[in-house]
Amino acid sequence: MGSHEQTADVTGQRFAALALAALGVVYGDIGTSPLYAVKEVFAGNHPIPVTMLNIYGSLSLIFWALVIVVSVKYVTFIMRADNRGEGGIMALIALALHTVHDKPQHAKWIMIVGVLGAAMFYGDGMVTPAMSVLSAVEGLEVATPALKPFVIPLTMVVLFILFFVQRSGTATVGAFFGPVMLVWFSALALLGVHNIVDHPAILMALNPAYGIEFLLENKAHSLVAMGNVVLAVTGAEALYADMGHFGRKPISRAWFAFVLPALVLNYFGQGALILGDPEAAKNPFFLSAPDWALYPLVGLATLATVIASQAVISGAFSVTRQAMQLGFVPRMEVQYTSDREQGQIYLPAVNWGLMVAVMILVLGFRSSNNLAAAYGIAVTGDMVITSILATVVVAKVWKWGWFKAGLLFACFLSVELVFLAANILKIPDGGWFPLVAGMGVFVLMTTWKRGRQLLSDRLRGERLELSMFLDSLASSMPTRVAGTAVFLNADPKGVPHALLHNLMHNKVLHERVVLLSVQFFDVPYVPDIDLVEVRQLKENFWSVVIQYGFKDIPNVPEALALCADAGLAFSSLETSYFIGRETLIPRLGSEMAFWREKIFVAMFRNAGSATAFFKIPSNRVVELGTQVVL
């Protein structure tokens, strides 16, 4: 009995720790939305009049958006669509693709829609840090208007420090994220209660009738307001994306028990404040605090927005690595910043690229009011794409059938498409930025995928069949030298070009030759028992296939060590790795547009080396080049 209670207690402690950690990572973005959501409705670039109906109506819409989009869609349904415990757009693409493996045309469209969703994520990832940190630092203007000239420089400094420390990893400071966000959400709730007490009638806005009346009364202008209401649910996709780190239950319990109540109390508190003092609409979040709490609140808000930005940056690293292993982006340098957590990674190219984009946004838009126009369209586009992919998964994987699945997600899409339409109106004011950025990423990802496919087809067309090559060795065996040669081989049925070049120029073969193929599958992880497949061929040739999931960390020497059980042992001092390196030449009239060929060639030229990506010892590598005309 005592042992059972102790186990339950440990389990409870573990669950509480996961829920606290989820507060710091999952809820940073949506948790900082109170800084600007209500303000943008009444004091943004397209404000609505401060009337009782508009206050009640906008709060009602915010509340029901949180319920329908976050509580029902994401927590109740989407988070159940996991790929072996993992969530996020890449996991959803993989699940949807499983349903159409025998229909290439359907798979193509699922791939296009999914990649578009991933590209929109990058557009959102550029705007979120700029919008969040700038909104927090703007609190200084409320405290002391004389500090207004320092808002932009201070925002730039905070953002630079944020991106600069990424290479050190978040393992140390990450331990503080949860407690800081616990204080933040507690502060949100207390500020809300403080103002609701003065005008408790504001709670009547929980009635959806006020939201409907607001839409009917404001007619076309209500669509503009909906573009600002959606700011309250930005960050909802993080619940699904980070599910693999914390699990569905800790994330959902934290939402219903703590995050949702704190957000609702704060939004309604801001509404109560504006109800009593319409002038407070210019910045209701900071004006809802007592004077003595203003500077501490600015400091806490800045910390919270840095944490929210950190989650987006880490998400960009994670999505990029997954996209890399699924073949949508070229290999690039990946640094692992924690010995214990393989999810904690750092990609220098992504980090500095994001930083430049964020700095340009801050300098270009110069205020959170202006940035709000750029915020939302990428998020709502991502939500719509998630609903489309989830419909496929629910219909085919969960076996609900198209009618029931379509009916369910039609309800969500009816809300999300209104949000998307509202944000399309923002395109001239700044919504073009995440769209252009997202479409740019989409073009790069699809160009890389298509280019790799064309290159593979070209090399396959020139290949020598492995069986024919091995048969020819029996009649004309070249000189064999001591040691083991490992040739990376994209096509297990063909002879690697590097092997043919080595044989042509050096006239020798190693005593033992290993043809190594590395394959990536649309599952998060591959267990060790399935990691390697070993086959012995003729003439002391061996075929080894290493299989990774899209979240695995490729390490060829470690994987090859598992081959010993199949009779293929490796000595690091006697093993050489031969890698082919192609020089690409674009040409007019190929299957891909010439301008895309040029982009692909540039990406290919700047891609990271296979040596670093697969953790192969550089002092044991021989690279052999060849020219390929696309």
From Swiss-Prot:
Pfam families, A to Z: K_trans, K_trans_C
Gene Ontology CC entries for this record: plasma membrane
Membrane association type: Multi-pass membrane protein
Cellular compartments annotated: Cell inner membrane
Catalyzed reactions per annotation: K(+)(in) + H(+)(in) = K(+)(out) + H(+)(out)
InterPro entries, alphabetized: K+_transporter (IPR003855), K_trans_C (IPR053952), K_trans_N (IPR053951), Kup (IPR023051)
Gene Ontology MF terms: potassium ion transmembrane transporter activity; symporter activity
PANTHER family: LOW AFFINITY POTASSIUM TRANSPORT SYSTEM PROTEIN KUP, OSMOTIC STRESS POTASSIUM TRANSPORTER
Function: Transport of potassium into the cell. Likely operates as a K(+):H(+) symporter.
HAMAP family: Kup (MF_01522)
Protein name, UniProt field: Probable potassium transport system protein Kup 1
